[in-house]
Amino acid sequence: MMMLFFTVAMVHIVALMSPGPDFFFVSQTAVSRSRKEAMMGVLGITCGVMVWAGVALLGLHLIIEKMAWLHTIIMVGGGLYLCWMGYQMLRGALKKQDAAASSPHIELAQSGRSFLKGLLTNLSNPKAIIYFGSVFSLFVGDNVGAAARWGIFALITLETLAWFTVVASLFALPKMRRGYQRLAKWIDGFAGALFAGFGIHLIISR
C-alpha cells in the first residue's frame, strides 16, 4: 500500500507542476492582487480536485466510456469558460495599456469570487479531465480497498493544497509584485492568451 501511495504522490506532483490553467490563475492572482486572494483561489482549486478525485475513485473512466455525449459537453463547456477567462484577462491588459499611469483595476476584490473562480478554473481544466479520467484511474482498480481509496483521496487533496500554497506564496513576494507592476499589461496579456489557447484547444480536440 505504501508503494501505491508513493507512486500516486509522485505522479500527482508531476501533474501539478506542469503549467496549466490552475497554475497561471494562482500565480497571476498572487502577483497582481494579494496572497489572500490567491489562497482563496487555491482553496477553490483544491475543492475542484476533491470533486475530480472523488468521481475518479467512483469510476470516472467508466462513466466517460459509456456516456460519450457527457465527455463532449464537459470539454466544450470547459473550453468556453477558459476562453471567457482569457478574454477577460486580455481586456484587462488593454485597459492597463490605456491607463498605465493609474492604479491597476482589481476585477475580483471579493475573496468569495476568487474561491469560485478557482473552483471553476479547475473543474473546466482540460488537464484535470484527462488526468483523472485516464491516468489517475489506472491506480484505483477494483483491487484497491475502501481504506486505500480514502487515503489516496486525502493524499491528493493535501498535495494539491500544499503545492498551490507554495505557488501563491512565491508569487506574492514583494520582488515578484514589483516586477509585475512594471510588466502588468504584458503578463496579463500573456496569461489571457494562454487561457484562450487552452480553451480553443479543448473545444477542437473534443
From Swiss-Prot:
The chain crosses the membrane at residues 1-21, 44-64, 67-87, 150-173. It is a multi-pass membrane protein. Residues 22-43, 88-149 are periplasmic. The keyword Transmembrane helix applies. Disulfide bonds: none annotated. It is found in: Cell inner membrane. Residues 65-66, 174-206 are cytoplasmic. Its main location: membrane. One of its GO terms (molecular function) is amino acid transmembrane transporter activity. It comes from the Bacteria. Keywords: Cell inner membrane, Cell membrane, Membrane, Transmembrane, Transmembrane helix, Transport. GO terms for biological process: amino acid transport. InterPro entries: Homoserine/Threonine_efflux, LeuE-type. One of its GO terms (cellular component) is plasma membrane. Pfam families: LysE. Conducts the efflux of threonine. NCBIfam families: 2A76 (TIGR00949), PRK10229.1 (NF007591). Belongs to the Rht family. This is Threonine efflux protein. It comes from Salmonella typhimurium (strain LT2 / SGSC1412 / ATCC 700720). The gene is rhtC.
